[in-house]
Curated annotation (Swiss-Prot):
Keyword Nucleotide-binding: no
Organism: Bradypus tridactylus (Pale-throated three-toed sloth)
Pfam families on file: Globin
Keywords noted in UniProt: Acetylation, Heme, Iron, Metal-binding, Oxygen transport, Phosphoprotein, S-nitrosylation, Transport
Residues of the Globin domain: 3-147
Tissues where the protein occurs: Red blood cells.
UniProt-recorded name of the protein: Hemoglobin subunit beta
UniProt cross-references to InterPro entries, sorted A to Z: Globin, Globin-like_sf, Globin/Proto, Hemoglobin_b, Hemoglobin_oxygen_transport
C-alpha cells in the first residue's frame, strides 16, 4: 500500500498519462543494464548486452522495458493493493527467475531518473517524492514473496 495524498495521486496520474511507455521503458531497463551491469545475467536470452550501444539498440530490451512500464502503470491504478496486484509477478521473480529483490529498487530509482530527464522542470521535487513513494511501494510488493 502506498500512502499518497489526493493531490499527489492526481499529479502522479497526470504525469503518467504523458509517459511514452515503450520509449521510457526501454530507456529505464537499458539504463539499469548499463549502470548495474550485473543485472544483465537475468537477461541472457536477450543477446548482446556488452555495451551501452548494444543495450540501447536491443529490441528485446525495448520490448521488455515496455512490458515493465505497462505493469507499473497497472500498479498505479491499484495503489491500495500493490501486493495483490503484483502477487503473480513476485512469485515468478522469486521462485522461477530468482531475481535479487534489490534490483526492483534499482529499477525504481532508474525510472525516476528517466522521468526527470524527460519532464525536466515539470518533474518537481514534490512529484519526485510522490514517485519515489510509488516505486518503493512497487518494489516492496514485488519483493513480498521473498519474505
Amino acid at each position: 500500500m502506498v500512502h499518497l495524498a489526493d493531490d499527489e495521486k492526481a499529479a502522479v496520474s497526470a504525469l503518467w498519462h504523458k509517459v511514452h511507455v515503450e520509449e521510457f521503458g526501454g530507456e529505464a531497463l537499458g539504463r539499469l543494464l548499463v549502470v548495474y551491469p550485473w543485472t544483465s545475467r537475468f537477461f541472457e536470452s536477450f543477446g548482446d548486452l556488452s555495451s551501452a550501444d548494444a543495450v540501447f539498440s536491443n529490441a528485446k530490451v525495448k520490448a521488455h522495458g515496455k512490458k515493465v512500464l505497462t505493469s507499473f502503470g497497472e500498479g498505479l491504478k491499484h495503489l491500495d493493493d500493490l501486493k495483490g496486484t503484483y502477487a503473480h509477478l513476485s512469485e515468478l521473480h522469486c521462485d522461477k527467475l530468482h531475481v535479487d529483490p534489490e534490483n526492483f529498487k534499482l529499477l525504481g530509482n532508474v525510472l525516476v531518473i528517466v522521468l526527470a530527464r524527460h519532464f525536466g522542470k515539470e518533474f518537481t521535487p514534490q512529484l519526485q517524492a510522490a514517485y519515489q513513494k510509488v516505486t518503493t511501494g512497487v518494489s516492496t510488493a514485488l519483493a513480498h514473496k521473498y519474505h
